[in-house]
UniProtKB/Swiss-Prot annotation:
Keyword line: Cell inner membrane, Cell membrane, Membrane, Transmembrane, Transmembrane helix, Transport
Chain ranges on the Cytoplasmic side, renumbered to this chain: 34-37, 90-92, 142-151, 391-406, 452-458, 503-655
HAMAP family associated with the record: AaeB
Lineage summary: Bacteria, Pseudomonadati, Pseudomonadota, Gammaproteobacteria, Enterobacterales
Keyword presence, Cell cycle: no
Membrane topology of the entry: Multi-pass membrane protein
Protein name (record): p-hydroxybenzoic acid efflux pump subunit AaeB
Protein localization: Cell inner membrane
Alphabetized GO MF terms: transmembrane transporter activity
GO terms classed as biological process: carboxylic acid transport
Transmembrane stretches, start-end: 13-33, 38-58, 69-89, 93-113, 121-141, 152-172, 370-390, 407-427, 431-451, 459-479, 482-502
Record topology, Periplasmic segments: 1-12, 59-68, 114-120, 173-369, 428-430, 480-481
Role played: Forms an efflux pump with AaeA. Could function as a metabolic relief valve, allowing to eliminate certain compounds when they accumulate to high levels in the cell.
Cellular component, GO, one term: plasma membrane
Length: 655
């Protein structure tokens, strides 16, 4: 396919984007809005953003959800701007500096919350800055300007959502159904690999792929939940299926590890059962029925605990999967599964990374302010706005430098493209609403094609072009103003890029160490006799951290194996029959405190000291278990955990 070719699957979204832009433009001028540009720009960004992220037409609900986040972020930003202006109207410089700090604060928050919701916080940061900069000459018009901006943005979002509904958005439900079947087959094949106890690299690749697919399925669940309220029952089942899929991975990998020391635990009967190849979910269903009969015949005590747990989890997976596909009423058996343990939310391990993002955004905005005041350039405020926009949106993504480069390419492409519209197209079409709408529709259509291909600069070009062409009411054509706006965008992106290059993010290794220590803390916290704590489901949170570790350190198998071993230890200790008495309960609390100290330690020396203390306490704990005559189901996992911590002590304590 050529670089400028148009694929059939890209046409529908390109028409949808063009329709959203035309609707916003028509409504903006029809109702005599002062700056219809904001409505058009909002419609374009809300519609094109999810398509750029997805690399194609977004699924149903994605545009609607992004629109809601933009409304929330805009309102938060407007309220913050009003508070800042009312409090500091007599000190304009201080007011702008506080806005720079506010933009940094919002970026810090957006780095810590879920990636789906971070857009609202990033938007609220630069919205406040835009309002404060715009009303510098007429501060008394702040409430009116904030209200107009909110109204125009809501209109733009409404147009994007309406265009999405008009062109029958894709439903993700069929993809979810197919992935559920495929995932169960892959889970069975992973257990086959683990029972064969073959090449460790092949097993690592298999479980790593399943972790990614399970995380992707959770993302599909979020999309399905946004799509329609009729998928509420499917959403509940998919939440439980996420935990079951992670449980299957854990039990398979534990089966592999057990065979390193005790291969005789896996009997020939089960080895023969798992030798049968499977291709479809029906094959898996037949095999599970055979296994359940074998387990009933041999007895639970004669069945390895990992296989027994795996078969039970796979059976529950099959039951819930059928419910998701049919979307029928939840049965009593399903309700019992769904009313399982409460899921514990993950605590962010990227606090240092978030602080780096705070300083990057704050410093770049302050640098833009100084540049504006020093040069007195009429479009210095435009440069400041672009700095805030780029840093607020770039910081929450894995590769901020590439986002900046995308914006730089986009603003450079917007200069000749905007020039064509400013000098030729708009002056010749402004007297006809039809021609004006058609000219903007052509722009939206062709950039919509490139956005779906994730062409570098396409998203930035769309936003930057709409921002600099004259879409105000009334239209005024001042070439110097156009040139200033276009150059201001380019300079702003350049300054943001320079700050990102200068303020280095060296938090990667620290984040990796914090993640590994959080796995250790989770394994230690599983040693408890507290009934409520034992019922907590930490598995989704632990695998979410493992997924982050895999993204931060691609290909680092030792880190992944260590993390997975800690997850297995957590699950095994959580189900272990620990003797219930006050002596052990007190010591459990002491172990948890020490593990928390390891995570929160501010220096390597403190961390090593607390880690050494944790190892000593684990040795004492093993002695206590011997005194209280704990069964092997307790003593063996604790011994394995202690051995792992001794082996990887340096990796867990050194920065």
């Amino acid at each position: 396919m050529g670089i400028f070719s148009i694929a059939n699957q890209h046409i529908r979204f390109a028409v949808k984007l063009a329709c959203a832009i035309v609707l916003a433009l028509f409504i903006g001028f029809h109702f005599q809005l002062e700056t219809p540009r904001w409505a058009v720009l909002t419609a374009a960004i809300v519609a094109a953003g999810p398509a750029f992220a997805a690399g194609g037409e977004p699924y149903s609900g994605a545009i609607r959800y992004r629109g809601m986040l933009r409304i929330i972020g805009t309102f938060i930003g407007c309220i913050a701007a009003l508070i800042i202006i009312i409090s500091m109207i007599r000190a304009p410089l201080l007011m702008i500096l506080v806005c720079c700090v506010w933009a940094g604060f919002c970026t810090w928050i957006s780095s810590l919350v879920r990636i789906e919701n971070s857009y609202a916080w990033g938007l609220s940061g630069y919205t406040a800055l835009i309002i404060v900069i715009t009303i510098q000459t007429e501060p008394l018009l702040t409430p009116q300007f904030a209200l107009e901006r909110c109204s125009e943005i809501v209109i733009g979002i409404g147009c994007a959502i309406l265009a999405d509904l008009l062109f029958s958005p894709r439903s993700i439900k069929q993809e979810v159904d197919r992935e559920l079947d495929s995932l169960l087959v892959a889970q069975y094949q992973l257990m086959q690999l683990c029972i064969k106890h073959g090449d460790s690299e092949e097993v690592d690749n298999a479980w790593g792929d399943l972790v990614r697919r399970t995380a992707a399925l959770e993302g599909m669940r979020s999309n399905l939940n946004m799509e329609s309220s009729r998928w509420v029952r499917a959403n509940r089942r998919l939440k439980a299926l996420n935990t079951l899929s992670l449980t299957l991975i854990t039990q398979s990998c534990e089966t592999y590890l057990i065979q390193n020391t005790r291969p005789e635990l896996i009997t020939d009967t089960f080895r023969e059962l798992f030798e049968t190849p499977v291709e479809t979910v029906q094959d898996v269903h037949r095999q599970l029925k055979r296994m359940r009969r074998v387990i009933v015949w041999t007895g639970e005590r004669e069945t390895p605990v990992t296989l027994y747990s795996w078969v039970g989890a796979a059976t529950r997976y099959l039951l819930l999967k059928r419910g998701v596909i049919s979307n029928t009423k939840i049965s009593a058996t399903e309700e019992e599964i769904l009313q399982g343990e409460p899921v514990v939310k993950v605590e962010s391990a990227e606090r240092h990374h978030a602080m780096v993002n705070f300083w990057r955004t704050t410093l770049s905005c302050i640098l833009g302010t100084l540049f504006w005041l020093w040069t007195g350039w009429t479009s210095g405020n435009g440069a400041m706005v672009m700095i805030a926009v780029v840093t607020s949106l770039a910081m929450r993504l894995p590769n901020p430098r590439m986002v900046c480069i995308d914006f730089i390419y986009g603003t450079l492409a917007a200069l000749p493209l905007g020039l064509l519209y400013f000098l030729v197209i708009i002056p010749n079409t402004q007297q006809s609403m039809l021609l004006l709408c058609l000219s903007l529709a052509v722009l939206g259509f062709f950039i919509g094609i490139e956005v779906q291909k994730r062409r570098l600069g396409s998203m930035g070009a769309l936003a930057s072009t709409i921002n600099i062409i004259v879409l105000d009411n009334p239209m005024t054509f001042h070439f110097s103003q156009f040139l200033d706006s276009a150059l201001g965008q380019i300079v702003g992106c350049m300054l943001a890029f320079i700050v990102i290059l200068l303020v280095r993010d060296k938090s990667k290794d620290r984040t990796g160490r914090v993640l590994l220590n959080q796995f250790v803390s989770a394994a230690v916290s599983a040693m408890t006799t507290n009934v409520v704590r034992r019922k907590e489901n930490r598995l989704p949170a632990l695998y979410q951290q493992l997924f982050l570790l895999m993204n931060k350190f691609p290909g680092d198998l030792p880190k992944f194996r260590l993390a997975l071993t800690m997850i297995i230890a957590h699950q095994r200790l959580r189900d272990a029959p620990i003797p219930v008495n006050e002596d052990l309960s007190v010591f459990h609390r002491q172990l948890r405190r020490t593990a928390d100290h390891v995570i929160s330690a501010g220096s390597d020396d403190k961390r090593r000291r607390y880690f050494g203390q944790l190892l000593d306490e684990l040795d004492i704990y093993q002695e206590k278990l011997r005194i209280w005559e704990a069964p092997p189901q307790v003593t063996e996992p604790v011994k394995r955990l202690t051995g792992m911590l001794h082996k990887y002590q340096n990796a867990l304590t050194d920065s």
